């Protein structure tokens, strides 16, 4: 018992006072904007269940410009009539720099369109997916498409340095 007490005392004395008094810092809220180029390629289903499902499987390849200088690759599943109504879900991994901070993170998409009008469209950071200087990243991205140009508006938080 005395050995354990001595060990605890030695540890307490050796820890810097600042480490003992640290309080968690609040995340910094940021806002990033820009546009991206995207290549969407149909993938051929390789099993009977995928063919029978009627779902379209597509690969995504993106180049982000602006506050997010990055590339991404991902996979999308889509259903619907292909022109005015449908839905898609997707996952993509983004690698590059966000406001100068390097790393990678994953995004998850969910969208519904009815008669040519988006009903829901969410794109959020997958919790725990941030790496490098983007570890702890959390946020949501809004995408608008006008005349074929994809613009993004990314509201996010990162732990303070």
Where does each model-flagged region fall?
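Targeting-peptide/extracellular-domain and disordered-appendage signature
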Residues: 3-5, 11, 15-161
């Amino acid at each position: 018992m005395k050995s354990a007490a001595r060990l605890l005392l030695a540890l307490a004395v050796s820890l810097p006072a600042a480490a003992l008094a640290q309080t968690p810092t609040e995340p910094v809220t940021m806002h990033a904007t820009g546009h991206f180029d995207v290549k969407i390629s149909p993938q051929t289903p390789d099993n009977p269940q995928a063919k029978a499902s009627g779902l379209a499987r597509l690969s995504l390849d993106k180049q982000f410009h602006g506050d997010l200088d990055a590339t991404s690759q991902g996979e999308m599943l889509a259903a619907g009539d292909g022109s005015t109504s449908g839905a898609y879900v997707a996952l993509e991994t983004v690698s590059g720099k966000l406001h100068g901070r390097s790393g990678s993170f994953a995004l998850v998409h969910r969208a519904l369109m009815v008669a040519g009008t988006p009903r829901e469209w969410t794109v959020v950071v997958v919790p725990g997916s941030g790496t490098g200087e983007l570890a702890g990243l959390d946020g949501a991205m809004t995408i608008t498409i006008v005349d074929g140009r994809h613009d993004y508006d990314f509201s996010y938080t990162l732990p303070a340095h």
